[in-house]
């Protein structure tokens, strides 16, 4: 909506590098669902699984510049569980940072944050000025996994640069990940987009709605009602009659009436307690 409101282009990218989590037909279902709800993207769909050479080239540049090191630490060795989402990774203590033998046998590659790295700062469209001491608050992070797969942060940075992305709007749960991506952009000589991290919808206890028992699937039969509800949650104050209007009519109202300033400074919106939907 932000891109359309500003007269820009909206791009669709399918993050399908992790083949174990990509069920057959899932990408097609994603696209079909977006269409049913009136989302229209510009250009061709970008599949990360088709762009591996770009990622390998970027990784080689980081390795040759000396900004990475091998890490053979297992999750059990570090007493951590595997993170299932970007932004939830634990802080790595630097165990293999000065261990040349780590490159012997299977190993991951980590981006080495400089010891004198200053705070990474940027102005977020919704959260205002954000700063992070990446070395202490994030730690050296994986750019290539132990199984050879390119990690999320590196793939995202490479794609944003290759596609000319100049604005990224996403959830506030990824706010703490952004400084790491900025470090990679600087290492690769890539531009940094404008970022905006929207508030999350959460349960009264703080859990993300998408991960809770009250989350309901998208239903094309009630697409208008669900779109209207999301706009209301996002403080856009859509006219009540739009809840029964065609999907296109909702978008025709929403795009010119987008008011991002109503969301400034908010990390989450806790929904009222109530029974789980039937």
Which residue stretches match the model-derived regions?
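Conserved catalytic-core subdomain
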Residues: 207-278
């Amino acid at each position: 909506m932000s891109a359309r409101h500003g007269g820009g282009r909206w791009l669709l990218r399918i993050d399908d590098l992790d083949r174990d989590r990509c069920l057959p037909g899932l990408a097609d279902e994603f696209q079909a669902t977006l269409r049913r709800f009136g989302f229209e993207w510009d250009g061709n769909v970008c599949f990360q699984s088709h762009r591996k050479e770009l990622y390998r080239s970027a990784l080689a540049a980081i390795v040759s510049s000396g900004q990475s090191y091998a890490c053979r630490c297992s999750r059990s060795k570090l007493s951590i569980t595997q993170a299932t989402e970007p932004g939830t990774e634990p802080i790595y203590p630097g165990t293999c940072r000065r261990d040349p033998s780590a490159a012997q046998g299977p190993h991951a590659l980590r981006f080495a944050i400089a010891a004198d790295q200053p705070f990474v700062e940027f102005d977020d469209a919704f959260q205002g000025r954000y700063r992070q001491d990446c070395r202490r608050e994030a730690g050296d992070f994986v750019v290539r996994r132990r199984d050879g797969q390119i990690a999320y942060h590196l793939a995202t940075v490479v794609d944003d640069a290759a596609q000319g992305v100049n604005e990224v709007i996403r959830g506030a749960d990824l706010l703490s990940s952004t400084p790491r991506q900025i470090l990679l952009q600087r290492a690769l000589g890539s531009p940094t987009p404008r970022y905006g991290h929207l508030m999350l919808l959460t349960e009264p206890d703080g859990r993300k709605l998408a991960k809770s028992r009250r989350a309901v699937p998208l239903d094309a039969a009630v697409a208008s009602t669900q779109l209207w509800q999301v706009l209301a949650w996002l403080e856009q104050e859509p006219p009540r009659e739009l809840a029964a209007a065609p999907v296109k009519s909702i978008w025709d109202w929403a795009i010119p009436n987008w008011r991002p300033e109503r969301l400034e400074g908010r990390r989450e919106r806790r929904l009222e307690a109530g029974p789980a939907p039937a």
